[in-house]
Amino acid sequence: MIKSELVQIIASRNPHLFQRDVVNIVGAVFDEITNALAEGNRVELRGFGAFSVKNRPARSGRNPRTGETVDVEEKWVPFFKTGKKLRDRLNGAV
């Protein structure tokens, strides 16, 4: 599913909302999650999961095409940990 499909589903389930309003709401939610992560904060959505950032330290890597050793810089990456309700639903529990 892509963002536009999510917007269409939410708009169809909420006919009292205009699609442009749903686009703005979904965009605002994603923006706030992104802003919180950029500030180093954790975003927890109970029952769904938690977004956080983790540090990947610098390391030596290898170019698969040439075999040459390259230095990979330290970086921060997004991380998602599923919540219990989501995990249970995916595994068939009710």
From Swiss-Prot:
The organism of origin for this protein: Brucella melitensis biotype 2 (strain ATCC 23457)
Subunit field text: Heterodimer of an alpha and a beta chain.
GO biological process terms held by the UniProt record: DNA recombination; regulation of DNA-templated transcription; regulation of translation
UniProt xrefs under Pfam families: Bac_DNA_binding (PF00216)
Gene it is expressed from: ihfB
Gene3D superfamilies: IHF-like DNA-binding proteins (4.10.520.10)
InterPro entries found in the cross-reference section: Hist_DNA-bd (IPR000119), Histone-like_DNA-bd_CS (IPR020816), IHF-like_DNA-bd_dom_sf (IPR010992), IHF_beta (IPR005685)
Keyword presence, Methyltransferase: no
Protein known as: Integration host factor subunit beta
GO cellular component, one term: chromosome
Record key words, sorted: DNA recombination, DNA-binding, Transcription, Transcription regulation, Translation regulation
Chain's role: This protein is one of the two subunits of integration host factor, a specific DNA-binding protein that functions in genetic recombination as well as in transcriptional and translational control.
